[in-house]
Curated annotation (Swiss-Prot):
A Pfam family per the record: DapB_C
Family note: Belongs to the DapB family.
Function description: Catalyzes the conversion of 4-hydroxy-tetrahydrodipicolinate (HTPA) to tetrahydrodipicolinate.
Organism encoding this protein: Shewanella amazonensis (strain ATCC BAA-1098 / SB2B)
UniProt name for this protein: 4-hydroxy-tetrahydrodipicolinate reductase
Residues the record lists as binding NADP(+): R38
Upper lineage: Bacteria, Pseudomonadati, Pseudomonadota, Gammaproteobacteria, Alteromonadales
């Protein structure tokens, strides 16, 4: 595809949606083609830029994809698992690419994403920050060097409104570490501890979750030995880091064939 990539943002009035609208406005090679809200929203008809606090864009919010089907090439979706699957099905029918930043999918829902990706290009990533994706590469190296003789813990914190726990990013951290060590995360993950738990099993990977205030996103992996520990941490101070990553993914995805891709591929880290 040549020229600008036309992007649609769904869930435009949410915290992430507003950041995505701002990122669209700031990125060369990206043009905002549509901004979509839930059906019946009182914001329908309002200028998307004025709603997001970035100035008049001359683009009114709508409440269904069919109304703007000819206005965009790539849909960006950070909504909910159920909503995202419905939007993905629509994109597959229409031949539209989709960038998915939604988290909280169960196993069956992930299988549906895989199936739809046979029909249309999909980037799906629990975190689109460049720093987080680099962190996953560092975790793979740390696990290979230290994982067999250290206790591994993952601690994550987000704002009080986040609905799923642990975060998709934390789970991906666990998957990267477990895969590097030849372990099955479903068998070795320990989610929180309470009461008399007994001595720690060296094979386990622990998860701890914080939900407080307006934390944007903080993730730490700890490799703890007797006498020393290594901590690898990423802290996001603004949702714009995720929104900017989504713009990068959208531009890359517009050139791809149908298939399921991740941010490692977008960034050339594979």
């Amino acid at each position: 595809m040549t020229g600008q990539v036309r992007v649609a943002v769904i869930g435009a009035s949410g915290r992430m949606g507003r950041a995505l609208l701002e990122a669209c406005d700031n990125h060369d090679g990206i043009v905002l083609g549509a901004a979509i809200e839930r059906a019946g929203s009182t914001l329908v008809g309002v200028d998307a830029g004025e709603m997001a606090g970035i100035g008049h864009l001359g683009l009114a919010l709508v409440d269904n994809l069919d109304a703007v089907a000819d206005k965009f090439d790539v849909l960006i979706d950070f909504t909910s698992p159920e909503g995202t699957l419905a939007n993905l099905e629509w994109c597959a029918r229409q031949g539209k690419a989709i960038v998915i930043g939604t988290t909280g999918f169960n196993h069956a829902q992930k299988e549906q994403v895989v199936a739809f990706a046979e029909e249309t290009p999909v980037v799906m990533a629990p975190n689109m920050s460049v720093g987080v994706n680099l962190m996953w590469k560092l975790l793979e190296l740390a696990a290979k060097v230290m994982g067999d003789y250290t206790d591994i813990e993952i601690i994550e914190g987000h704002h009080r409104h986040k609905k799923d726990a642990p975060s998709g990013t934390a789970l991906k951290m666990g998957e990267v570490i477990a895969q590097a060590l030849g372990r099955d995360l479903e068998k070795v993950a320990v989610y929180g501890r309470e009461g008399i738990t007994g001595e720690r099993d060296r094979e386990t990977i622990g998860f701890a979750t914080i939900r407080a205030g307006d934390l944007v996103g903080e993730h730490t992996a700890m490799f703890a030995d007797i006498g020393e520990r290594l901590e690898i941490t990423h802290k996001a101070s603004s949702r714009m880091t995720f929104a900017n990553g989504a713009m990068r993914a959208a531009k890359w995805l517009a050139e791809q064939k149908p298939g399921l891709y991740d941010m490692q591929q977008v960034l050339g880290l594979n």
